[in-house]
UniProtKB/Swiss-Prot annotation:
Source organism: Rhodopseudomonas palustris (strain ATCC BAA-98 / CGA009)
Pathway in which this enzyme or protein is active: Bacterial outer membrane biogenesis; LPS lipid A biosynthesis
Residue numbers annotated as active site: H256 (proton acceptor)
Protein name: UDP-3-O-acylglucosamine N-acyltransferase
UniProt entry keywords in alphabetical sequence: Acyltransferase, Lipid A biosynthesis, Lipid biosynthesis, Lipid metabolism, Repeat, Transferase
Lineage: Bacteria, Pseudomonadati, Pseudomonadota, Alphaproteobacteria, Hyphomicrobiales
GO BP annotations listed: lipid A biosynthetic process
Length: 360
């Protein structure tokens, strides 16, 4: 359940108020004044908690829940125990999230809470930097020459904003992050330890590996979120661009000259080599690696732990190493399994194969 020590909730709400906020229907009006103080999963919830159900995998948890109320679709309404108030919703999880955002609005941004609003005494801000009203700079952060920061933005403790960087309004730059050669839009959220604008991995790979100057920038458009430890290299000649609304998980590496479209989703530990292009609404599972100069079309999806060496047409689903259309990938895996079973590859080792005998 939600931790009230780290995320103090708003005052409690009645089920009538929750129904109005989530656009759900309270099935039994006699519960209208029952108050909810927090959120919890079905198995942890108590009488003052709201939970939700939309997956039959959790039927046992629903049958045994002690929750005060449950958001559920009309299809599963009859499964809710009689002591639990029913809030009927077309999309229960969406409704649950709507109330969670209302109840725990502080959890939506990566605040560290180590500094008070305003400029910390130990922050270092160059005299030529321009900060709009209501900017917060936490302890030990460093703001370099000619930096511009928009109102409502928070610069986390120990962050370094190098010369000439421009940051828009209502951003959160996580503690220990480092930004250089970058232009950042409005409402951009960076979790701790992001590194933006360092030089790309550009060399002439021969002899002593001659370094190629990286003279481009990183441009991050509005409403982007970057997970902890994510790194984005600046371009060599053209810019590295992250499109509006894109959400990037922890520990993702994005190489120089990469262009990522709008509203993409990139899960943890992906590695994107230089000069590739992702269209709009592309989804990459965790630990996907993509070769340089590849183009991934709008709406394409790549399964976790795939290796992509070829361009992917718009709207297609690929997976595997090397990645190919998922139907082809599944057929190949099934064929290999049948081949292995038919060849007796899973038979026991020969009795005289005692190479590891006695090994501790």
């Amino acid at each position: 359940m939600a931790s009230t020590s780290f995320f103090p909730p708003r005052p409690s709400s009645t089920l009538a108020e929750i129904a109005s906020l989530t656009k759900a229907t309270l099935v039994d009006a006699s519960y209208a004044e029952h108050r909810i103080t927090g959120l919890a999963s079905l198995d942890e919830a108590g009488p003052m908690h709201l939970s939700f159900f939309e997956n039959l995998r959790y039927s046992d948890e629903l049958a045994n829940t002690r929750a005060g109320a449950c958001l559920v679709s009309e299809r599963f309404e009859g499964r809710v125990p009689s002591h639990v108030a029913v809030l009927r919703a077309r999309r229960p999880f969406h409704a649950f999230v709507a109330y969670a955002r209302h109840l725990y609005s502080d959890a939506l941004r990566p605040h560290t809470g180590v500094g008070a609003p305003g400029i910390a005494p130990t922050a270092v801000i160059h005299e030529t930097a321009k900060l709009e009203d209501e900017v917060t700079v936490e302890p030990l952060a460093v703001i370099g020459p000619d930096v511009e920061i928009g109102s409502g933005t928070v610069i986390g403790a120990g962050a370094v904003i190098a010369a000439g960087v421009k940051i828009g309004r209502d951003c959160d730059i996580g503690a220990g992050s480092h930004l250089q050669h970058a232009l950042i839009g409005n409402n951009v959220l960076m979790h701790p330890g992001c590194h933006i604008g360092q030089d790309g991995f550009g060399f002439i790979f021969a002899g002593q590996h001659t370094k190629v100057p990286q003279t481009g920038r990183v441009i991050i458009q509005h409403d982007v979120e970057l997970g902890a430890g994510t790194t984005i290299d600046r371009g060599s000649l053209r810019d590295t661009v992250i499109g509006e609304g894109t959400k990037i998980d922890n520990q993702v590496q994005i190489g120089h000259n990469v262009t990522i479209g709008r509203h993409c989703v990139i899960a943890a530990k992906c590695g994107l080599a230089g000069s590739l292009t992702l269209g709009d609404n592309v989804a990459l599972g965790a630990m996907v690696g993509i070769n340089n100069h590849v183009v991934i079309g709008d709406g394409a999806q790549v399964a976790a732990m795939s290796g992509v060496k070829d361009s992917i047409p718009a709207g297609e689903r690929w997976g595997g190493i090397f990645a190919r259309p998922t139907r082809t990938w599944f057929r190949e895996m099934l064929a290999v399994r049948r081949l292995a079973e038919g060849s007796g590859a899973e038979t026991a080792a020969r009795p005289d194969d005692d190479r590891d005998e006695g090994r501790g």
